[in-house]
């Protein structure tokens, strides 16, 4: 089954020069134990945290740190990533090992992790601006 990554690029309004990075960001370790999204997900989690922290400081410049921390925690979590991933139907782009080659439902954790990995893959494209495509922001 061939995956149309161009349709994902269109959804997030971002064109990847390095398609291999995009493919790796959407590859689960069950499909490829060596080139998968785990390290890119690690980066994506940090990028997401930094972008959200920066945005919260812009929106609430006078707010106390404790309140900002609560707002941050409500935004940077697996459920938020899952909601974003569902909004762009990210599961349809994720490669997982499927021994029977049948359509299967991908676990929510894999979808959420893939969203963080996608954010990690976006970082090299937009790191000078520390922004994410609007579709990925809640």
Go through each PLM region and give its residues:
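Single conserved hydrophobic/aromatic residue that forms the stacking wall/gate
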Residues: 129-138
């Amino acid at each position: 089954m061939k995956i149309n990554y161009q349709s994902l690029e269109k959804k997030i309004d971002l064109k990847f020069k390095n398609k291999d990075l995009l493919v790796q960001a959407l590859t689960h370790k069950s499909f490829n134990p060596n080139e998968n999204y785990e390290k890119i997900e690690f980066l994506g989690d940090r990028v997401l945290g930094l972008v959200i922290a920066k945005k919260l400081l812009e929106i609430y410049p006078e707010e106390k740190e404790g309140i900002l921390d609560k707002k941050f925690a409500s935004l940077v979590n697996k459920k938020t990533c899952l909601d974003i991933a569902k909004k762009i139907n990210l599961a349809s782009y994720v490669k997982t090992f499927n021994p029977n080659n049948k359509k299967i439902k991908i676990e929510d954790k894999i979808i959420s992790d893939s969203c963080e990995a996608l954010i990690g893959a976006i970082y090299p494209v937009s790191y000078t601006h520390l922004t994410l495509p609007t579709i990925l922001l809640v």
